From Swiss-Prot:
Motif, Nudix box: chain positions: 171-192
Record key words, sorted: Hydrolase, Magnesium, Manganese, Metal-binding, NAD, Zinc
Source species of the chain: Vibrio cholerae serotype O1 (strain ATCC 39541 / Classical Ogawa 395 / O395)
Protein name: NAD-capped RNA hydrolase NudC
Enzyme class: hydrolase
One Pfam family per UniProt: Zn_ribbon_NUD
Gene Ontology biological-process entries: NAD catabolic process; NADH metabolic process; NADP catabolic process
Sites where the protein binds substrate: 81, 136, 204-211, 253
Catalyzed reactions per annotation: a 5'-end NAD(+)-phospho-ribonucleoside in mRNA + H2O = a 5'-end phospho-adenosine-phospho-ribonucleoside in mRNA + beta-nicotinamide D-ribonucleotide + 2 H(+); NAD(+) + H2O = beta-nicotinamide D-ribonucleotide + AMP + 2 H(+); NADH + H2O = reduced beta-nicotinamide D-ribonucleotide + AMP + 2 H(+)
SUPFAM superfamilies: Nudix
The protein's Enzyme Commission number: 3.6.1.-, 3.6.1.22
Molecular-function annotations in GO: magnesium ion binding; manganese ion binding; NAD+ diphosphatase activity; NADH pyrophosphatase activity; RNA NAD-cap (NMN-forming) hydrolase activity; zinc ion binding
């Protein structure tokens, strides 16, 4: 478990131009230099420091957010996924910048009255110029679950997955259901399997664009595996010795898979 330094804001904090991490974002993409978030001064990187907003700190250095549209010179943008291998605290800081950027780009107008929104200078939220309604970043709650059946783990492949990658079951939480109910429903709908012993594992913000992944472990109860091919390309039970390519390191899906395999290995010892 990582320890994040909390930032207490009474207002939006601007950059002083000193050495910092600079997250220049557009959608779920950001500017990387040699695969890393640029570090240094605003002057060094020719960035408009007056438009940079503090979103976090990493190793005692500030992490600033800038929208790519606010920079005169175009910078090559790369998916946030390219940072999955970096330290988790820095990845989460970059994720925060991406989500604030998404907020500023997608909540430009007030859904209450249609007025123009602007970035509120008391907190990181968009506010309507006319009716003054505050609009915070949208966060979509999702579950993700690793299901174990004796010495095997349930893994699924989605049509969007490349290189034959398999992962665990995931889905969005519906209105009026608990997280545990969502776990049971998603597994049943996508695979025909009924699960039991549902238990919390951890969470991960997932800025693609604005999800919060809440992870669970569960055990097989009953049912015959019948993949929903409108959602999945394949689903199957896999043992330690016959694993397919799985989700990359840095994802909570990979952490769930590794935990389940470790539990299986311990039981086999």
């Amino acid at each position: 478990m990582i320890r994040l330094q909390a930032i207490r804001r009474s207002r939006v904090e601007k950059s002083d131009g000193k050495n910092a991490y600079w997250c220049v974002v557009s959608g779920s993409d950001l500017w990387l230099v040699d695969g890393q978030i640029p570090y240094g001064s605003a002057e060094q990187w020719d960035l408009p420091q007056e438009k940079a907003i503090l979103v976090d700190r990493y190793q005692n250095s500030p992490v600033y957010w800038l929208n790519a549209a606010d920079i005169e010179q175009d910078r090559p943008l790369t998916s946030l996924r390219e940072l999955l291998g970096v330290d988790e605290a820095l990845f989460l800081a970059a994720s925060k910048a991406v989500q604030y950027g998404h907020m500023s780009q997608t909540i430009r107008f007030c859904p209450q009255c249609g007025g123009r929104n602007y970035l509120n200078h008391q907190q990181l939220a968009m506010q309507c110029h006319d009716c003054r309604t505050l609009h915070y970043p949208r966060i979509f709650p999702c579950i993700i679950v690793a299901v174990r059946k004796q010495q095997q783990i349930l893994l699924a492949q989605h049509p969007r997955h490349r290189n034959g990658m398999y992962t665990v079951i995931a889905g969005f939480v519906e209105v009026g259901e608990t997280l545990e109910q969502c776990v049971a429903r998603e597994v049943l709908e996508e695979t025909g399997i009924v699960v039991t012993n549902i238990r919390y594992f951890g969470s991960q913000p997932w800025a693609f664009p604005s999800s919060m992944m809440m992870a669970f472990l569960a055990d097989y109860d009953t049912g015959e595996l019948k993949p929903d091919y409108s959602e999945l390309s394949d689903a199957n039970w896999f043992g330690i010795e016959n694993l397919p390519p799985v989700a990359p390191r840095g994802t909570i899906a990979r952490a769930l898979i590794e935990q389940t395999l470790a539990d299986i290995a311990q039981d086999q010892a």
